[in-house]
UniProtKB/Swiss-Prot annotation:
Pathway membership, UniProt: Cofactor biosynthesis; pyridoxal 5'-phosphate biosynthesis
Subunit organization: In the presence of PdxS, forms a dodecamer of heterodimers. Only shows activity in the heterodimer.
Record lineage: Bacteria, Bacillati, Bacillota, Bacilli, Bacillales
Name of this chain's protein: Pyridoxal 5'-phosphate synthase subunit PdxT
Binding site for L-glutamine: G47, E48, S49, R105, I134, R135
Length: 188
């Protein structure tokens, strides 16, 4: 059975754990670098990316997560996770640099501009995925190595590169497990 960790420093940790378990994998909370040992994949949940980055640095998690990815292990970042995994963050904040694109934080606006949208994901077929965007980022300037999986208003909101999958929205806040299934079946 696949073992998936969820970075448990802030954000929708419990919701991701429930989604992982409902997809048939084992879920573990990751708070320290040693918690990465033995995992097949890692989820960086939504939350507040600046706060998450500061905590990751304080607990010395940045380099171990980069090393985890360099071993070919899969990482799935949602919302703030997308921001943290991007090569660059607009404004120059430090990131993990694992997907070759630039993240625009709060790209669709602040909390009051949160919204839902139907996304037609080729890999999923019908029906459309009901995506929940909360202070959502998006990606710009992807390299040729990045596969764009979904856009809203011509903005990249889901993408993958090698073993890295990112969404600007929160699949863990829905009852639709197709993103986690995709991660487990195609990436891990």
């Amino acid at each position: 059975m696949k073992k998936i960790g969820v970075l448990a420093i802030q954000g929708a940790v419990d919701e991701h754990i429930q989604m992982i378990e409902s997809a048939g994998a084992l879920a573990f909370k990751v708070k320290h670098s040693s918690d990465l040992d033995g995992l097949d994949g890692l989820v960086l949940p939504g939350g507040e990316s600046t706060t998450m980055r500061k905590i990751m640095k304080r607990y010395d998690l940045m380099e171990p997560i980069r090393a985890f990815a360099s071993e070919g292990k899969a990482i799935f970042g949602t919302c703030a996770g997308l921001v943290l995994l991007s090569k660059e963050i607009e404004g120059g904040e430090e990131s993990l640099g694992l997907i070759e694109a630039t993240a625009i934080r709060n790209g669709f606006g602040r909390q009051k501009e949160s919204f839902e949208a139907e996304l037609n994901i080729e890999a999923f077929g019908e029906p459309a995925f009901e995506a929940i965007f909360i202070r959502a980022p998006y990606l710009i300037e992807p390299s040729n190595e990045v596969a764009v999986l979904a856009t809203v208003e011509n903005r990249i909101v889901a993408a993958k590169q090698a073993n890295i999958l990112v969404t600007a929205f929160h699949p863990e806040l829905t009852n639709d497990n197709r993103w986690m299934n995709y991660f487990l079946e195609k990436m891990v």
